[in-house]
């Protein structure tokens, strides 16, 4: 009896690491010390001495049951980018610049090519966010998970000067809310998605005119990463007063998280067109509109609040980063919360 007979293939683990090295290499930043394969990842803080009070911000997240869709479609090259997006977008909400990222993959069986493909998506997300993939873990769990299934989680650390942390504390009535378009469902609410649609090959591979693609392609579209857009906004000299990443809980749960007491957000639903995938989900699943806005991003993945004088500069910076911004509402005095009208 040996370890391999028990279901853990050490050689497969070694092969996975070798296959993923080429992807990881493309994410490196000058501050990274050492290479892949050590017991830990090291990152120099020397280049941040210009900050008055350098402050680390961190985030951890996963992709929820969206991974189930990757299994069903046998498509694993974008789910890693989803994981990165969920972490770095949260860091960006605090005004942070993502520095590095670590991933954790648990699988029933280590198929090296599949693991490397997952990591290629992680690396792509890191490149979009400008952060280094400095470490990770692939854990083989025979008997605990089915052989063809896996789960992944991510951990990211960023930096911001303390004076630049986005807190929402100085929001004022009249401040403008600008939302950036999402790429689709992003990475939450997939348990409901799997109840709305039959999760079989025929259903997922059916082309829909209203979507302009198959259902599976629309659902598996990788989560948009907003780090570059927020970086461009900052470099344009705009001070973002508050920021909300629209994830699980949709508008109703996430927008109040950026508000101080005594400030109320008003969102105009007609300020942009809700993407077809959400319209289809509501129709096919007979999901009430309020539940949709309380579960999904409904086409807006990130919302920032800025002074009215900064609106034009903010929109221009977001467009320069390749994002699509909309003026979606404003801040008013009142009970902390959000109204959709």
Identify what each model region corresponds to.
Residues 2-6, 114-132, 145-150, 202-204, ...:
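Glycine-/charge-enriched secondary-structure boundary and capping motifs
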Residues 17, 116-119, 190:
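Hydrophobic face of alpha-helices
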């Amino acid at each position: 009896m040996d370890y391999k007979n028990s279901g853990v293939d050490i050689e497969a683990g070694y092969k996975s690491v070798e296959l993923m090295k080429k992807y990881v290499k493309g994410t490196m930043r000058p501050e990274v010390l050492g290479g892949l394969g050590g017991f830990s990842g090291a990152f120099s803080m020397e280049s941040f001495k210009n900050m008055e009070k350098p402050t680390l911000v961190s985030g951890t997240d996963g992709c929820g049951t969206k991974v189930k869709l990757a299994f069903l479609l046998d498509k694993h090259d974008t789910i890693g980018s989803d994981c990165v997006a969920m972490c770095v977008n949260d860091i960006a909400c605090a005004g942070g610049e993502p520095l590095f990222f670590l991933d954790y993959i648990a699988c029933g069986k280590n198929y090296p090519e599949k693991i490397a493909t997952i990591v290629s998506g992680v690396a792509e997300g890191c490149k979009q966010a400008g952060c280094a993939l400095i470490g990770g873990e692939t854990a083989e769990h025979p008997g605990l998970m089915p052989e063809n299934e896996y789960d992944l989680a991510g951990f990211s650390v960023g930096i911001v000067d303390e004076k630049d942390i986005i807190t929402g504390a100085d929001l004022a009535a009249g401040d403008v809310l600008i939302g950036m378009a999402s790429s689709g469902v992003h990475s939450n609410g997939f348990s409901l998605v799997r109840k709305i649609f039959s999760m079989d090959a025929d259903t997922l591979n059916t082309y829909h005119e209203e979507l302009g693609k198959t259902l599976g392609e629309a659902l598996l579209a990788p989560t948009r990463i907003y780090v570059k857009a927020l970086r461009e906004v900052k470099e344009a000299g705009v001070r973002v007063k508050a920021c909300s990443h629209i994830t699980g809980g949709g508008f109703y749960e996430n927008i109040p998280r950026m508000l101080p007491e005594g400030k109320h957000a008003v969102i105009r639903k007609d300020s942009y067109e809700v993407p077809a995938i959400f319209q289809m989900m509501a129709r096919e699943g007979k999901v009430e509109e309020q539940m949709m806005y309380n579960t999904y991003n409904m086409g807006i993945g990130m919302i920032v609040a800025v002074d009215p004088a900064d609106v034009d500069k903010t929109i221009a910076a977001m467009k320069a980063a390749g994002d699509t911004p909309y003026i979606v509402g404003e801040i008013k005095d009142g009970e902390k919360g959000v109204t959709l009208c």
